[in-house]
């Protein structure tokens, strides 16, 4: 359950919060790197040890075609390193290949974390993804869980920081590794036996929903027609809560804390630490979903943790099978593939400061306690604290006409583009947002 307060927005070009890091050197030249782009002799095929590694290697092109298009942004020395690692892979020299991968990943990581994320050349993201692919293969030494878990983390890092290569092979590799890890464990998600009681307590003690005055309540409609929604809400830019439009989604019956852990518990995700992203102590950390649930939901760490504005459904397609694209998105100008689907998963008490989004937004509550968190950090975020406004510093805020609502399970809130809104989580929540044009 969540409380949402909003008001019409102003003109501007909102941007998402971005990663920033230290300065870095420039790049020179470009090439196509890989064992197939030179005359050096390489071992045909690949020398694999074990069925898991063979299954992963089978997802990649043949050795002669295993090459990466780098472009002019990437240093020639990096292209040579890519080629070297590829040749070591082809020869089955796993330890040496792993060493080359680590050097390659360190170099690419520095470039990925230099300056704003939007300015990072996609070629460097491909290099990073390539390094993660080879690293995952190198790590699959034994049949146990530990090696596969480490390899799975490498795949997730490539999915989080890299770009799609070889037909988005990292998603397929991660699926195989995840299935292997789960088959070895042969038990529910980590900590579920001890954490279930705590999780149930967290769900059974929600904060009472605040009463919303009728004159400021967001209107509610049950399954309006496309034409009615377009004429009365989309075109005028009016918020509305749509009821009954997602009741058929599998997640409405299947999803629970335990289910999320079972399907995604061993996957590495970015977690925001801090109650709101405008706080000075706010930060981001990488951890598995199981660790996130244990630390921030079950045991309720002092620092609030939030899996916010993350494209989890691209990373874990198994979860995407449990949701759908709202029919009303067909009224937009873009294609379905251009819709950005974000997951928002966290405990009671997280706050999304007053902000606006760059596109139309549908926000869906997925289970008995779900909520969103819109994490933009720059000029699309207001300086005003909605709950404790400084009216001496911002006197005109007292004149703002606002709407409010409390989202219940299965509700879908339409938030028009650039419409200012503020969100507070009233309970443990998992929500899905759809940004569309």
Q: Where are the predicted features?
A:
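N-terminal accessory scaffold of Fe(II)-dependent oxygenases
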Residues: 2-412, 420-437
């Amino acid at each position: 359950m969540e409380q949402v307060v909003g008001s019409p927005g102003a003109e501007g070009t909102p941007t998402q919060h971005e990663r920033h890091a230290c300065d870095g050197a420039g790049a020179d030249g470009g090439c196509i790197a890989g064992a197939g782009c030179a005359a050096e002799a390489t071992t045909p095929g690949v020398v694999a040890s074990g069925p898991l590694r063979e299954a992963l290697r089978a997802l990649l092109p043949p050795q002669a075609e295993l090459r990466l298009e780098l472009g002019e942004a990437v240093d020639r020395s990096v292209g040579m390193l890519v080629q070297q690692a590829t040749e070591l892979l082809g020869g089955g020299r796993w330890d040496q290949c792993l060493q080359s991968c680590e050097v390659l990943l360190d170099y690419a990581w520095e470039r990925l974390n230099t300056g704003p994320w939007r300015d990072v050349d996609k070629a460097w993201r491909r290099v990073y993804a390539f390094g993660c692919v080879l690293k995952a293969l190198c790590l699959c030494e034994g049949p146990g869980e530990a090696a596969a878990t480490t390899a799975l983390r490498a795949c997730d890092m490539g999915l989080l920081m890299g770009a799609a290569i070889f037909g988005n092979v990292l998603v397929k590799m991660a699926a195989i590794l995840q299935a292997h890890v789960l088959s070895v464990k042969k038990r529910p998600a980590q900590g579920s036996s001890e954490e279930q009681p705590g999780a149930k307590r967290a769900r059974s003690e929600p904060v009472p929903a605040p009463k919303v005055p009728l004159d400021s309540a967001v209107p509610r409609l049950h399954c309006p027609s496309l034409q009615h929604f377009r004429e009365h809400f989309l075109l005028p830019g009016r918020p509305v809560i749509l009821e009954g439009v997602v009741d058929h989604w599998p997640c409405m019956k299947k999803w629970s804390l335990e289910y999320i852990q079972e399907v995604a518990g061993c996957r590495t995700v970015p977690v925001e630490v801090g109650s709101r992203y405008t706080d000075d102590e706010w930060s981001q950390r990488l951890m598995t979903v199981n660790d996130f649930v244990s630390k921030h939901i079950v045991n309720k760490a002092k620092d609030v943790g939030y899996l916010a504005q993350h494209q989890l459904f691209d990373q874990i397609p198994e979860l995407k099978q449990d949701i759908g694209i709202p029919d009303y998105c067909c009224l937009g100008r873009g294609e379905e593939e251009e819709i950005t689907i974000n997951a928002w998963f966290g405990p009671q008490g997280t706050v999304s400061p007053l902000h606006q989004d760059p596109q139309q937004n549908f926000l869906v509550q997925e289970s008995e306690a779900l909520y969103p968190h819109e994490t933009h950090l720059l000029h699309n975020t207001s300086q005003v604290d909605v709950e404790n406004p400084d009216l001496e510093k911002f006197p005109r805020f007292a004149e703002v006409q606002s709407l409010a609502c409390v989202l219940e399970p299965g509700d879908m809130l339409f938030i028009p583009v650039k419409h200012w809104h503020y969100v507070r989580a009233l309970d443990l929540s998992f929500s899905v947002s759809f940004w569309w044009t």
